[in-house]
Amino acid sequence: MKKIAVIGGGASGLMAAITAAKNGADVTVFEKNDRIGKKILQTGNGKCNYTNLDMDDSYFYSSSDNGIIKKILSKFNEKDTIAFFENLGIVPRNRNGGIYPYPETATAILDVLRMEVERLGIKLSLSNTIDSIKEKGTGFIVNSTFFDRIIIAAGGKSAPKTGSDGDGYKIAKRFGHKPLKALPALTQLISNEKYFKSISGVRAEAYLSLYIDGRFIKKSHGELQLTDTGLSGICSFELSSLISRGIDSKRKAEVEINFFNDLSKKDFAELLRKRIKLQPERPAELLFTGIFNKKLSLLFLKMASVSLNKNSGSLNEKELATLSDSVCSFRVVISSVGDFAKSQVTSGGVPLNEVNENLESKKKKGLFFAGEVLDVDGICGGYNLQWAWSSGFSAGKAAAFD
């Protein structure tokens, strides 16, 4: 019976431990907190969107992927995840493809994982920081105990209050790995533009286009939240990993916002002409009434240098074009992103080209990785938890059988 140490008692670590134990291994989970699964409780705003029915590798980012993400997801996919938790007692709730536990509380997921850990006799070493890992023969000495295999599932640097502080990267470096710089992802976008204070609190459906050094990179869509420092909301979060990387490499990151149903500037200008024709005497201040929030409307007019008291019917073609440009092509230069304390996941980590298809290290046999410690981060919607389940399953099974 192989003795396996799992470093980290989060989602990927617990899945790795459970999988290894089911395959006959003697498993010990080392967790620096006084309880396991602390970060799980924060997922999905506490509701725990634990997977998604629309799942493939295109929803993940990695600057070192060589096809491994797709292979890992195929070994334990979203259907396997749903079945796994159903067998533990979770009834799934489908919300537009996002899968939640029926009571929509993360404690339900953590509770069944705890019960399975107990049922399988997995040992928990809590409030335990790893002081040393040494090689011994074909195995390892963790602190003072021998193990045949080690699975590093210590997470990244996001949400440090849950215990994620980059310890996994330090361990990886001891064995010759070169983790890519850890950066915040799934976090707010910060701009130096002063006008954001005037529109803080506004929410609007929008299409966002990301440009790095003037080159189009990616598009997203959803509810955008405007804050006093910039952009928030899922659609902006989905661009944050790429923006983080761009800014870190000293490139210009710019987001173009279309506030009106992805309509072209030409078509929106025509829409304005029709509105003006109906009520040409209406003051420009009221031109967007029924379309946009007042705060946003006033900003559009200000950016187009249009007087609030001017009759809509007297707006010239240049002013209409400028207004349409403000609405459909609102450009925001991003100066930075939210820090690790505000981010949901980490971009960067152990490069995928430094592990094999079972997530075993190419540098040291018997050393495996799972979860956020690897150079993989997904968008919002259950994708990062699916990566945790899939990678944990793959590492746990391989470690037990290797």
Task: Tell where the protein language model's regions lie, with residue ranges.
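A conserved FAD-binding loop/helix module that cradles the flavin
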Residues: S158-I171, F175, V376-D402
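Glycine-rich loop(s) and the adjacent beta-strand/alpha-helix scaffold that form part
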Residues: R149-Y195
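An anion/pyrophosphate-binding glycine-rich loop and adjacent beta-alpha core
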Residues: T28, D34-I36, L41-Q42, Y50-D57, ...
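Glycine-rich active-site loop/strand segments that organize a redox cofactor
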Residues: N45-N94
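N-terminal Rossmann-like FAD-binding beta1-loop-alpha1 element of flavoenzymes
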Residues: K3-V29, A395-A400
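A glycine-rich dinucleotide-binding beta-alpha-beta segment and adjacent secondary-structure elements
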Residues: L126, S297-D377
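A conserved short coil-to-beta-strand element within the FAD-binding core of flavoproteins
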Residues: L126-G139
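Short hydrophobic core segments
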Residues: A5-I7, F30, I130, F146-K161, ...
